[in-house]
């Protein structure tokens, strides 16, 4: 697995962790020595240290000196053989929990075993494929379904290689054939195709109707971060408490930027994301946008002009042929210990990889958690997500609408997004086909989810979606065109469907972490630090800088293992972990890294709490 260049999100995570550590050390250094982090292990603040530390001047990790590593490796095998028996308990058999098990099997640490407890009868967590039958392509991915081949996703694709799952192309963009319907109008070329501007009877100012106002607001911060991360980070932190909506409304921190009215902001949100997602942190929106600053470009010589030009490198998107569950199925087969399913955990003094909503229902009193960690578990915002798949007698979107290259349809109707599968485009015009008819997030998902649960309500849900599909795919917006399309879609529908709401799922209690204003800068470091004297690690996408992605769950698993091994001083295993699995950028190892301080953070906080009491 290659080591990617440090991402912008990685730099952000490192800075937040360093700032939190510096603040805590400065708070405590006048009161007591700090245990459990440096070398020797009776404290790392030695005489002669400066009176105050800063994010870029933290106590060093002396183990990373050549002399100390050499001495540690010389005796590592003998010491590890003499270690007392220990067990790692992994709560949750999603991709993070299974990944931890795979790594522990590879490390082969003497006298260390593990067990995996899963409350659900199904293994995989938020990687979940629903099969309507055993027929080829008679499925859809309820959870993770598409993976961009970009540098920050290297660990995910490395896992694909290790598990040998079959990949195929995923078509994110299906071209002009994929319909868009907003304000009861199908897309047409022009400045205001949906007639929401004041000139066309709407409420959005004419000069703003076709602008990317969110992208324009993000741009100066992104450019500042690229030019000089330290200066850019300071500027971004000044607006960390703003939601995207509030930032656009008031014109930034000082009110000197462009201010937008309610209708302009609403229209921008409708076009760019799901209902109410502009309520997430502005800083989070800025950093998230870096993930999709692709395609990249490369320089080539234009044969016509013989001049150097920049050529776009399109991003490859992949999906797993047969469904994403093949990944977690393969991982489960590779690990040495069986997953214990239907094991409901009521109290915790071990390592959870479960979602925070589920963790919050467990009795955590024995852990003596920092109050702010308890607050993070309770209050960190999770987004909702609902998917509805319908099965049809034939792929009418291909046969009747010419949508034969995947992609998505977008609308302000309740279904919001329709996803045309990439895996069944060549299955023939007469075979049954599954369509991801509705994919919603945030408030759109909450409202769609309100129709889940009873036969009558789900009958209404399916009817709404069938009618929405007809309106979106009709050749025009006349009633006659709609009726004709509705008859076609309704006749093609087999009567078979599947619906899933992640916020209604008792094993997840939400789809993925989506930090609100100020939450990432304040809560992320706390979620990433070990607790309970280094024995408790919160693992999963919520405790990663790349939350809401599979790679975030994988990164958090490696980060937790590294800090566990560092705390136990298992030097040989640490080096093997670095060589075989790489360490995510937010851990920051090396003599000037922060991993040793993250391990010691909980001990500092415990002493501070006792003094304050």
Predicted features and spans:
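Conserved flavin/dinucleotide-binding core of flavoenzymes
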Residues: 3-72, 362, 400-613
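Mobile amphipathic helical/loop "lid" adjacent to a hydrophobic cofactor/ligand pocket
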Residues: 3-24, 161-162, 169-284
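Glycine-rich active-site loop/strand segments that organize a redox cofactor
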Residues: 4-19, 23-39, 125-155, 174, ...
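N-terminal glycine-rich phosphate/pyrophosphate-binding loop and immediately adjacent elements
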Residues: 77-223
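Generic structural signal for small/hydrophobic residues in well-ordered secondary structure
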Residues: 124, 160, 248, 331, ...
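Active-site/ligand-binding neighborhood in enzyme catalytic cores
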Residues: 223-348, 352, 359-360, 385
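Flavin (primarily FAD) binding-site architecture
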Residues: 351-372, 386-389
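Central beta-strand plus flanking loop segment that forms part of the substrate or channel wall
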Residues: 371-399
């Amino acid at each position: 697995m290659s080591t990617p260049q440090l991402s912008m999100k990685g730099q952000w995570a490192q800075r937040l962790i360093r700032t939190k550590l510096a603040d805590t050390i400065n708070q405590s250094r006048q009161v007591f020595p700090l245990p459990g982090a440096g070398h020797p292990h009776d404290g790392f603040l030695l005489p002669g240290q400066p009176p105050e530390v800063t994010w870029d001047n933290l106590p060093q990790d002396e183990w990373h000196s050549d002399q100390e590593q050499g001495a540690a490796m010389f005796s590592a095998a003998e010491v590890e053989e003499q270690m007392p028996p220990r067990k790692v308990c992994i709560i949750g058999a999603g991709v993070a929990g299974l990944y931890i098990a795979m790594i522990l099997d590879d490390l082969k640490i003497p006298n260390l075993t593990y067990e995996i407890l899963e409350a659900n009868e199904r293994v995989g967590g938020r990687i979940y494929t629903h099969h309507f039958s055993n027929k080829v392509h008679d499925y859809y991915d309820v959870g993770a379904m598409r993976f961009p081949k970009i540098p920050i996703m290297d660990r995910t694709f490395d896992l694909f290689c290790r598990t040998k799952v079959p990949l195929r192309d995923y078509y994110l963009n299906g071209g002009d054939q994929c319909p868009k319907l907003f304000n009861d109008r199908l897309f047409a070329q022009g400045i205001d195709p949906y007639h929401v501007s004041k000139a066309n009877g709407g409420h959005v100012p004419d000069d703003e109707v076709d602008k990317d106002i969110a992208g324009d607001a993000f741009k100066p911060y992104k450019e500042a971060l690229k030019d000089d991360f330290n200066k850019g980070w300071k500027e971004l932190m000044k607006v960390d408490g703003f939601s995207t909506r509030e930032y656009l409304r008031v014109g930034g921190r000082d009110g000197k930027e462009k201010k937008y009215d309610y209708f302009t902001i609403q229209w921008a949100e409708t076009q760019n994301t799901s209902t109410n997602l502009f309520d997430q942190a502005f800083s989070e929106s800025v950093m998230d946008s870096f993930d999709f600053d692709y395609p990249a470009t490369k320089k080539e010589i234009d044969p016509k002009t013989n001049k150097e030009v920049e050529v776009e490198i399109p991003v490859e998107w992949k999906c797993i042929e047969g469904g994403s569950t093949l990944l977690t199925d393969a991982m489960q087969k590779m690990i040495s210990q069986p997953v214990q399913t239907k094991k409901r955990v009521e109290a915790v003094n071990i390592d959870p990889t479960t979602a925070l909503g589920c963790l919050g229902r467990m009795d955590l009193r024995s852990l003596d958690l920092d109050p702010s960690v308890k607050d993070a578990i309770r209050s960190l915002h999770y987004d909702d997500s609902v998917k509805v798949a319908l099965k049809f007698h034939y792929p009418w979107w291909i046969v009747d609408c010419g949508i034969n290259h995947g992609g998505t349809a977008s609308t302000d109707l309740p279904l919001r997004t329709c996803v045309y599968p990439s895996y069944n485009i060549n299955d023939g015009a007469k075979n049954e086909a599954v369509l991801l008819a509705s994919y919603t997030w945030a408030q759109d998902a909450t409202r769609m989810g309100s129709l889940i649960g009873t036969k009558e309500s789900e009958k209404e849900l399916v009817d709404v979606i069938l009618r929405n599909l007809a309106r979106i795919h009709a050749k025009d917006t006349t009633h006659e065109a709609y009726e004709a399309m509705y008859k076609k879609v309704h006749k093609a529908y087999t009567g078979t469907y599947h619906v899933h709401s992640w916020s209604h799922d008792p094993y997840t209690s939400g789809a993925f972490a989506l930090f609100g204003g100020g939450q990432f800068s304040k809560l992320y470091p706390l979620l990433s630090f070990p607790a309970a004297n280094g024995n408790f690690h919160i693992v999963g996408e919520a405790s990663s800088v790349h939350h809401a992605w599979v790679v975030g769950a994988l990164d958090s698993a490696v980060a937790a293992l590294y800090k566990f091994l560092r705390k136990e001083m298992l030097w040989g295993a640490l080096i093997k972990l670095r060589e075989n699995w790489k360490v995510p950028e937010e851990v920051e190892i090396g003599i000037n890294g922060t991993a040793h301080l993250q391990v010691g953070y909980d001990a500092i906080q415990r002493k501070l709490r006792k003094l304050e009491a």
